A protein has these predicted regions:
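Conserved beta-strand positions in the central sheet of alpha/beta enzyme cores
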Residues: 48-51, 78, 101-102, 125, ...
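Glycine-rich, proline-tolerant flexible connector loops at the mouths of alpha/beta enzymes
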Residues: 46-64, 104, 165-175
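Charged helix-capping and loop-helix junction motifs
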Residues: 60-67, 141-150, 175-184
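Conserved anion-binding
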Residues: 11-12, 19-23, 90-93, 97-171
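Glycine-rich phosphate-binding active-site loops on the catalytic face of alpha/beta enzymes
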Residues: 83, 94-112, 167-170, 198-202, ...
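Conserved, mostly hydrophobic/aromatic
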Residues: 8, 39, 47, 92, ...
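Glycine/small-residue-rich loop that forms an oxyanion/phosphate-binding "nest" at active or ligand-binding sites
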Residues: 53, 61-118
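Catalytic cores of alpha/beta
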Residues: 72-73, 77-98, 180-216
Length: 239
């Protein structure tokens, strides 16, 4: 299983939100590159970066930080947050970003998403955020009428090979992740590499996710609070 420690950026700082709420933000550092180096030292080979400003208002205010992370290298780098145009995808890929994550635009413009999946293949992942089982968009403020599992099936049919699935209720809450959900996704949407995201806070959960065939897991607040030790997690489950 791949482990993606997460760096969420707001105003160039390393932060975490609780359940996607911008008013419940904790700053964990001022230097994203230094944080990434710490992850490398712990054995990480992958990095999940979210531009929270981009996700909220489409700006590129964290572009410099992301460019510096890409230039620093040493990690497979996936980036999400505010990627809604092919121009933005190209901008990131040309920096050296390995994979771009499409979020809300996958719901609001499925045709565009299908075209990007066809054009860029495995260099595109889709982030699916679900609230009570239904797809949520725009920083989790809007909830659609489509079930997350059904949306994942549509994405798979459009050629999507990687989906980062977040159960919003779990995210940043440090109460554990929704293991039953990832078991269901693996069974009902075969052929897609799912990344578990949100609430993972124990080694037992990581081992269970690996056992059920989950492709990857994102670790956020659990690392920053010290609930999980990245070096130990890498030794336990990383390919």
């Amino acid at each position: 299983m791949q482990l993606f420690p997460a760096i969420d950026l707001r105003g160039g700082k390393v932060v975490r939100l609780t359940q996607g709420d911008y008013d419940r933000m904790t700053v964990y550092g001022e230097a994203p590159c230094a944080q990434a180096r710490q992850f490398v030292e712990a054995g990480a080979r992958y990095l999940h970066v979210v531009d929270l400003d981009g996700a909220k208002d489409g700006t590129l205010s964290n572009y410099g930080s992301i460019a510096a992370l890409a230039e620093q290298g040493g990690l497979y780098l996936e980036v999400g947050g505010g990627i809604r145009t092919e121009e933005r995808i190209e901008k990131y890929l040309s920096l050296g970003v390995d994979r771009c994550i499409l979020g809300s635009v996958a719901v609001t413009d499925f045709d565009f998403t299908a075209r990007m999946l066809k054009r860029y293949g495995e260099r595109i992942a889709v982030g699916v955020d679900a609230k009570d089982g239904f797809v949520a968009t725009h920083g989790w403020k809007e909830v659609s009428a489509e079930k997350g599992v059904d949306f994942c099936r549509r994405l798979a049919d459009a050629g999507c090979v990687a989906i980062i699935y977040t159960d919003i209720a779990c995210d940043g809450a440090m109460q554990g992740t929704n293991l039953a959900l990832y078991r269901q996704l693996a069974a009902e949407v075969p052929g897609v590499a799912f990344t578990a995201s949100g609430g993972i806070s124990s080694e037992a959960e990581l081992l269970e996710l690996k056992k059920m065939g989950t492709a990857a897991a994102i670790l956020g607040k659990s690392l920053y609070t010290g609930a999980l030790d990245l070096k130990r997690c890498v030794e336990l489950v990383q390919n």
